[in-house]
Amino acid sequence: VLITGSNRGIGFAFVQHYSKNGWNVIATCRNPNKADDLQLLMKNSTNIFIEEMDVTDFEEINTLAQKYQGYPIDVLVNNAGILGNVPKQSFGNLDYDLFQTVMAVNAFGPLKVAEAFADSVAISNQKKIVTMTSGLGSFAIMGNFDRFFFYKMSKSAINMGVLTMNASLKSKGIIAALISPGMVDTKLLDESGYQGRNKISPEESVAGLVKIIAEISLDTMK
């Protein structure tokens, strides 16, 4: 399994879960040297491989994909994501440089990572690419909610991207799916200003997500 944004939050919980259950885990993040919890977890494990990869740096993505060329990756988890500065996502005060950054991380990045590692996924047994989405990207749920312009637009974009990716990769037997973690107690949720009581821990979220990932099949994606 390859997991992006694995240094904290949901990504780190994915690394914990999969490594504990005997998977070889390629844990990627922007700054491995600053990922203290991840480094400690690796030292106490034999199946975690930490790699530097910024999902907005296409050269880094291509280099890492080359390194693992011919190595089967059963599950690719596109987890890396950012919310972005909230006040700068209000109409009348929109920061379009920030828009580029949020789109680069949340929409362009997952698509590029999937494209770069698709050959490794194709030669695996499970052949799954899963990408984190959010209810904030839903027209039905959040269409009338006036905050988080860029985050919402980036999630809507990657939602369509993954649907199109699934159609594009079916001939290779690859499944591309969206998964939503729920209201998880992470730095991103804190940045959003959410004050609700229904938050769950990253570990709780991942326990449910890995079951969904395990049950995803070509039949369930029809």
Which residue stretches match the model-derived regions?
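Structural signature of the Rossmann-like NAD(P)-dependent dehydrogenase/reductase core
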Residues: 3-4, 78-79, 128-134, 175-180
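N-terminal Rossmann NAD(P)H-binding glycine-rich loop of SDR-like oxidoreductase domains
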Residues: 7, 11-16
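Conserved glycine-rich Rossmann-like NAD(P)H-binding loop of the short-chain dehydrogenase/reductase
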Residues: 21-36
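The beta1-alpha1 cofactor-binding region of Rossmann-like NAD(H)/NADP(H)-dependent oxidoreductases
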Residues: 51-63
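Catalytic loop of short-chain dehydrogenase/reductase
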Residues: 82-83, 90-103, 122-171
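Conserved Rossmann-fold SDR core element
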Residues: 159, 165, 169-184, 220-222
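C-terminal helical subdomain
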Residues: 178, 186, 190-222
